[in-house]
Amino acid sequence: MGDWGFLEKLLDQVQEHSTVVGKIWLTVLFIFRILILGLAGESVWGDEQSDFECNTAQPGCTNVCYDQAFPISHIRYWVLQFLFVSTPTLIYLGHVIYLSRREERLRQKEGELRALPSKDPHVERALAAIEHQMAKISVAEDGRLRIRGALMGTYVISVLCKSVLEAGFLYGQWRLYGWTMEPVFVCQRAPCPHVVDCYVSRPTEKTIFIIFMLVVGVISLVLNLLELVHLLCRCVSREIKARRDHDTRPAQGSASDPYPEQVFFYLPMGEGPSSPPCPTYNGLSSTEQNWANLTTEERLTSTRPPPFVNAAPQGGQKSSSRPNSSASKKQYV
């Protein structure tokens, strides 16, 4: 029961990271092969060598005739077929587990770097490198890995290997045994003294079992080919969508503008219906306001007494530094 539990865990892991056709193939593989071989295979082929009888008393003749009739037992041949066909799937599962562990380590390292109080350039470069590596691992919202990039390549190679192995084992079974189990096998091999007739037990039941396993093998091969077509269509549709998005992206802005469209705020440069003129101070222009200030200052100066009445200016002394009215007017103008 422990072995079945281990196989069940492997089945769950592979089904989570497979396509719809791949899940159907796994169902065919585990139900119609493992269960049939485990439950009915031993009961049908258990007496294969013990009930193989030949019409001779020569010692060793029955063994060599059985070896000639069955170079490898059917049940062992199907077990080898199951192991070889399942190996590419297990390799793909190992790649999935490796990417999952790597994604977890990258997230943990990213959290440790973001928790640091100081952000020096080395930390920023390390975070950028981690984000670049995590971008290569496509993870869905539910935590499963998407079949993209390197994982897609591994998956396609595994399906190709399964198809080749499936076709090879079907051809080998046809070359070794054919499609039916004959009730009488004619043997002529040393140390048999002459042509010997050997008899197989339950040939009709074994013929039905052989045909059933051949049909299961053909179904598995067809499913593998359908999965290859499905993956090819998926990659082509994704490439077409990416090119379409790339072509429609520059159409959002002008063709001559290489920069993305941005929003800028401009101040009104002239008067218009949407921008009323700015009101002036007291309705006067700047020149008129300067003249008004100059007149007020002269009026205040004429009414104020001079600060030094007793100090008469001498001959060589300079005059007052206040400019005359014409100079002031020029200054203010």
UniProtKB/Swiss-Prot annotation:
Keywords, in A-Z order: Cell junction, Cell membrane, Gap junction, Membrane, Transmembrane, Transmembrane helix
Stated family: Belongs to the connexin family. Alpha-type (group II) subfamily.
Tissue: Highly expressed in lung.
Entry's Gene Ontology BP terms: blood vessel development; calcium ion transport; cell-cell signaling; endothelium development; response to pain
GO cellular component annotations of the record: connexin complex; gap junction
Its membrane topology: Multi-pass membrane protein
Chain ranges passing through the membrane: 21-40, 77-99, 149-171, 209-231
Provenance organism: Rattus norvegicus (Rat)
Gene: Gja4
Stated name of the protein: Gap junction alpha-4 protein
General function of this protein: One gap junction consists of a cluster of closely packed pairs of transmembrane channels, the connexons, through which materials of low MW diffuse from one cell to a neighboring cell.
Keyword Secreted: no
